[in-house]
Amino acid sequence: MPRITRRRTLSANTISPQPRRSSGRVLIDLLKITLYATILLIFSSTLIARYEIEQTSMEPNFHPGQRIIVSQAGRAYGSWLSGSAYAAHPSSAAAIGLQREQIVVFYETDDQSEPPLIKRLIGLPGDLVAIHDGGVFINNRRVPEPYLSVPTDCSAYCSLTLGADEYYFLGDNRPVSHDSRQFGPVPGNRVIGRVVMRFWPLDQLTIFS
């Protein structure tokens, strides 16, 4: 049982002596702090990642030099649940929680030594994606894209139905963007995560849902 001691009333000039802590106790406390800090660092680095934008393909909404934070929570959560229902497609929409029009960072190929791309998610698994007449259509309905200033052209991968673990991405700067119109749909295991914050420059700080 913990002991309870009665608090003494001290005068204004009285100094209550503090018990001296042994060097062993101090060392244990330092080790605890170091352990907690290490766990926090590993946890945060698993769930989020920071990137600097180097591409113009998302202008005018994102510019080179801006810095963003990407949530990797879905990717990490899916990998932690190995052996469960997520194991078949650990990076599926259910695991990552991706939604259309979110800004997503992903790898174009399986070579993850190459810099990732940042694009807008247009099509989810099972969607019928079609690009014609200057617009993008999902399941035969035209997608409103108020963030665009020019029509959308396409010469390849212009009409397709996405597979069970495939995603279709487009850049906002359509005339210069290298995206799913050129390299096709992206499998879920290449997705890093969605952009949740632009934190630099500070005057352009933005939170993304």
Task: Show the residue positions of the predicted features.
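Extended hydrophobic leader/signal-anchor segments used for secretion and membrane insertion
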Residues: 1-209
